Amino acid sequence: MEGMLKGEGPGPLPPLLQQYVELRDQYPDYLLLFQVGDFYECFGEDAERLARALGLVLTHKTSKDFTTPMAGIPLRAFEAYAERLLKMGFRLAVADQVEPAEEAEGLVRREVTQLLTPGTLLQESLLPREANYLAAIATGDGWGLAFLDVSTGEFKGTVLKSKSALYDELFRHRPAEVLLAPELLENGAFLDEFRKRFPVMLSEAPFEPEGEGPLALRRARGALLAYAQRTQGGALSLQPFRFYDPGAFMRLPEATLRALEVFEPLRGQDTLFSVLDETRTAPGRRLLQSWLRHPLLDRGPLEARLDRVEGFVREGALREGVRRLLYRLADLERLATRLELGRASPKDLGALRRSLQILPELRALLGEEVGLPDLSPLKEELEAALVEDPPLKVSEGGLIREGYDPDLDALRAAHREGVAYFLELEERERERTGIPTLKVGYNAVFGYYLEVTRPYYERVPKEYRPVQTLKDRQRYTLPEMKEKEREVYRLEALIRRREEEVFLEVRERAKRQAEALREAARILAELDVYAALAEVAVRYGYVRPRFGDRLQIRAGRHPVVERRTEFVPNDLEMAHELVLITGPNMAGKSTFLRQTALIALLAQVGSFVPAEEAHLPLFDGIYTRIGASDDLAGGKSTFMVEMEEVALILKEATENSLVLLDEVGRGTSSLDGVAIATAVAEALHERRAYTLFATHYFELTALGLPRLKNLHVAAREEAGGLVFYHQVLPGPASKSYGVEVAAMAGLPKEVVARARALLQAMAARREGALDAVLERLLALDPDRLTPLEALRLLQELKALALGAPLDTMKG
């Protein structure tokens, strides 16, 4: 490993670099950040990597016989740099000085105190606001998938039957880091596909089975525990493992989450989550995300959620008061985890105290029935123990309040007396020497000193010992000052030690309330989500959905689009029907499809919905094929992706599913497209799925299906061009207005004119061809045709139907 230093020189490694190499050998997959005074340094290859990543100047560590590249970051900016490095894909090993330099005998002792990877973070400043999952995937009896959020202790997993279901769950949870079992890491095809779909850090861990259940899941659980224990130094604070069944929630494939922009925008910045997120706490925000990932299927829990939201809708003053108080709360869920792991800082306990001071106000607003645990004894202890604004680190000192610990108070009193000596010394020496500008100062190099300016050098007593000469002043010390200084230092060390002891005692007592804190965080997160959904409902005019056997939406709106533009509401009524929607591009067909799905999704989350009235069935899944999502990098055309998504819909959708299809078949020839679209429409009609099918194929509007309904999006040609009304009306569209939309898009006038001429010619040709076919058929006597004549007749009719070749049409 010494070779990684890329050093030059004949001599042995200096002790500092020997210590660096020894620690670096223990963590070969990590970038070692090695504390040297006020900086974290890297040496050799790691220094070059750090300098490249952060744009730092590369310097060199030089000793008598050895030189190596060096780069570093200041301790005070560690978190900002660490966040950047983690996002770039680095794993970080942080080696801190674990003893004061002045107390070290020789080389300062250093230990790796933190291992930081994207999926195992505990530090609030480095964590995202959403859940921070570490995932593990193993094979066996299905696909074993497990998730762990180290920051909250959430620990869960499932077994999936297909790779597509696995990918859906990964997209739904969006882990920050993934552990892959050896058989997957060695599978080149799988690895390539996985990396293209999920650009997250991939890590290795032993996949030894853990717990009960299917082998694949047990292996995934074991990998999470092994990896997390290594990064956390063996200490974990976990909730009991929970097996979850994705089938217990509304099915939302990856294509649906993408098309509906639930968490990630296709364009712009707004998503369904962003327009709903009026939460005031971090746990509330994470809970809202979880609800959106897992819409409910059972009416009872849904109605219970809606009752709570409605309560806050009706009680505006209560809603406002609760939200105002929630805004002041710390992230109690993550704070409880840091408490249990012994990682809570003085600042954490200060934030906990402020949060606990808010709980009585919340209880007074909401009543005892809300079920918040009584944490007043802990609040009172923290109020008594901690200063008003505790520092981030214990080593900074000054965190325990005066009067809390008698031993600490006595040490502080003695220290004040020691410091007072130097203040008295300044006055005494001024009088004794007659030097009016004499003053006592302090710095870290010389300790306490007496400072005299140039005009009074001749008055300096002989017993003054010079320690530093500056441009216009000199600094001195006295033997008695050194004795007092040593005593002050000794007392400061004792104060630091006692403060740390007291802090650890207080933190240990707070740790005993970690489970109660988690319970409080859970209750408050739910209240936060209910109040947030109510705030959205009141502010934007949402209504409570009603559940039944039909879908009936009056004046429905798109919850995201209406925030950024004036929106035209629309109605929809259907029951196990196939609804065909025709109309020109840009008229709003896709928006209408999406708004219907979003209203259904919101209803099964437990939210009010953007409409004047909404009656909905309980859907078991929402399936979409909306818009082109090319996978050209993966070797798949738009049409191939479209067909794969349609295949999944036809495989999984039931009569209780909501299916949204937009322009199925457009990625191939017109004849093929019509054939495919017709077959898909017939299959979904037969299945009785609630299907909204937007299409330009007018042939579909004439399908003789009993449960088919035609709608169209209104548009009209006016003098200034095509006008879109964005209204969804009964019946099929009269025409597609493709040429008019092309003109609006800015195609050259001569191209538009040529397109109109071709369109008219083709329409005339088609009409003439149909007349010719009809005339020929009426002249036939089928009973007198031989098989050979019938075959020739079919060929003739086909030629008549096709009409003249396109290239015979001249503009």
Swiss-Prot record:
Keywords: ATP-binding, DNA damage, DNA repair, DNA-binding, Nucleotide-binding. GO terms for biological process: mismatch repair. InterPro entries: DNA_mismatch_repair_MutS, DNA_mismatch_repair_MutS-lik_N, DNA_mismatch_repair_MutS/MSH, DNA_mismatch_repair_MutS_C, DNA_mismatch_repair_MutS_clamp, DNA_mismatch_repair_MutS_core, DNA_mismatch_repair_MutS_N, DNA_mismatch_repair_MutS_sf. CDD domains: ABC_MutS1. SMART domains: MUTSac, MUTSd. PROSITE patterns: DNA_MISMATCH_REPAIR_2 (PS00486). This is DNA mismatch repair protein MutS. It comes from Thermus aquaticus.
